Amino acid sequence: MASISWVLNSLFSILLLTQRVNSESTAEKQALLTFLQQIPHENRLQWNESDSACNWVGVECNSNQSSIHSLRLPGTGLVGQIPSGSLGRLTELRVLSLRSNRLSGQIPSDFSNLTHLRSLYLQHNEFSGEFPTSFTQLNNLIRLDISSNNFTGSIPFSVNNLTHLTGLFLGNNGFSGNLPSISLGLVDFNVSNNNLNGSIPSSLSRFSAESFTGNVDLCGGPLKPCKSFFVSPSPSPSLINPSNRLSSKKSKLSKAAIVAIIVASALVALLLLALLLFLCLRKRRGSNEARTKQPKPAGVATRNVDLPPGASSSKEEVTGTSSGMGGETERNKLVFTEGGVYSFDLEDLLRASAEVLGKGSVGTSYKAVLEEGTTVVVKRLKDVMASKKEFETQMEVVGKIKHPNVIPLRAYYYSKDEKLLVFDFMPTGSLSALLHGSRGSGRTPLDWDNRMRIAITAARGLAHLHVSAKLVHGNIKASNILLHPNQDTCVSDYGLNQLFSNSSPPNRLAGYHAPEVLETRKVTFKSDVYSFGVLLLELLTGKSPNQASLGEEGIDLPRWVLSVVREEWTAEVFDVELMRYHNIEEEMVQLLQIAMACVSTVPDQRPVMQEVLRMIEDVNRSETTDDGLRQSSDDPSKGSEGQTPPGESRTPPRSVTP
């Protein structure tokens, strides 16, 4: 009986705990929904009410997902005033980052409930009002950055309540009055470009001049020494009590002479005082003019949009730096496409460690690892001729394309000097690297089933671009076919041709361009089909279209294959790595016929892309998975049906009609 009672009590306790966790999660979820519903935002966060808040973009929970510990929404286009009763209800929050948005108004007083908060980043917004008193009650705060806003009034002495604070960034606001003596263990401190005056307290004098620059009336510490223009000079002995001196020496000076001396001395003093005031006003006017000409934010490093290999930096929670983009980069922000899964901004990209993945005809691709661990690919375009409006219009079209075999555009950036595209990172790499990588003894060959899978999934992606999106790819090649670990592919670098000038002809040695593109310098759906046909030949032969060993100098891959087939040496066409697999000759010949139809020199004789896809799927034989793709087998002793073939089963491939 006692054991039953213990079990019932345990179950009751678990039920109460579960109910409590659910209520806490529901309350925090509702707080976030309240925030999102009352704050307009340019980039849709697409928080699904039916999903757990812990799975939403920018939201991180604790290990058991009972409470929200981090909310990061930098550069997400948030506009307006934070509603009371929203974020202030996230009482377990540790990190809050709303930087680089257009949030305005005063900070809600219920922010004082965020007593567990350690890092608060609100820089580069339009917040106003005096220093929020709610901040001084956040005793666990370590980093506070409210720089580049419109805060006014004095900096309160109660900042000293934040005993754990190591970084305080208040620059580029309208704070005025004297600096309070802040006796905290600050490592980073910045109040530049405000209206502060008076002397810098000794407790803050250890920081560099850059921390205080832009405050004209601030002095002391690392700045100029404080001086008073109204200190009376030591009086001359000749003017000390002249009447007494005269009387002691029994001077014969008359009273009129004494009065004249006093008046003259007063006039000289007034002239000196007027001169000092004139010099003071002149100096102040010059300082104001210099400050007016100084671009804001001053004292903050402006960073060029460059991702050099090996660049790196520490996490936001560690640095808390208030890097301003300034000028054009402030006006041209990173634009996220609809349905994006990322929440970072241009500043994050600039601080990311970067590695060059490759250089192509349209630009250079970098692997960028952001501070929170997210990995993306940043393509830096070159020689873009499109205007900003044309660029943005084309990116809106590209950004709407969603398909499992088309890599999605996540974000883009346009400025006069830089054009950037952001994509998902595919760790398996490209078809080019997999097919033409080192062919030494340590290489794992790409078997036939995986080559068929690559051909089908790439065809599906390209057919979607042509049929559903009505978009010409324009740059199909093996390096633009990216792979998932299961050998499914994603087509990349699509729809970019309209951004570049047609004045320069494509490089014929590239090997993928249709003959008519060399003449018209325009890509079409049929030229895409030609390029895809070259890609199929590449899968079949194992040869790169750029490979010099195709025979005659200047011969391309389609002509080389055609010359071999005409001599009825069809077997010589196929990649030697495929010769170890049995019972696949018929499929290889069928795929070769499809490829040769695609690379017809007459555009009208080429099939449309959806027909190409249908033909490739027909080649795919009986052993299929649920998605219509065959299971891969790396065992060359097994036939394509999974059976061990007899030793004499290999038959010569049938001929291909040119």
UniProtKB/Swiss-Prot annotation:
Give every Protein kinase domain span. 351-619
Chain spans, region Disordered: 289-329, 619-658
Q: What keywords are assigned to this protein?
A: ATP-binding, Glycoprotein, Leucine-rich repeat, Membrane, Nucleotide-binding, Phosphoprotein, Receptor, Repeat, Signal, Transmembrane, Transmembrane helix
Query: Where are LRR repeat segments found?
Result: 65-89, 90-113, 115-138, 139-164, 166-183, 184-207
Q: Which InterPro entries match?
A: At_inactive_RLKs, Kinase-like_dom_sf, Leu-rich_rpt, LRR_dom_sf, LRR_N_plant-typ, Prot_kinase_dom
Q: Which Pfam families match?
A: LRR_1, LRR_8, LRRNT_2, Pkinase
Task: According to the UniProt record, list the residues that bear Phosphothreonine.
Answer: 374, 520
- Positions that bind ATP: 357-365, 379
Give the way it sits in the membrane. Single-pass membrane protein
> In which broad location class does this protein mainly occur, judging by the first location in its UniProt entry?
membrane
Q: Where in the cell is it found?
A: Membrane
Q: Which residues carry this modification: Phosphoserine?
A: 353, 430, 637, 640
Q: Which GO terms describe its cellular component?
A: peroxisome; plasma membrane
List all Basic and acidic residues biased stretches. 619-638
The membrane spanning regions, by residue number, are 258-278
Glycosylated residues?
Answer: 48, 64, 113, 150, 161, 190, 197
Enumerate the GO terms in the molecular function aspect: ATP binding; protein kinase activity
Could you say which residues form the signal peptide? 1-23
Q: Which PANTHER family match?
A: OS01G0607900 PROTEIN, OS05G0588300 PROTEIN
The similarity annotation says:
Belongs to the protein kinase superfamily. Ser/Thr protein kinase family.
Let me see what the UniProt entry remarks about domains. The protein kinase domain is predicted to be catalytically inactive.
- Name listed for the protein in its UniProt record: Probable inactive receptor kinase At2g26730
> Which species does this protein come from?
Arabidopsis thaliana (Mouse-ear cress)
* Biological classification of the source: Eukaryota, Viridiplantae, Streptophyta, Embryophyta, Tracheophyta
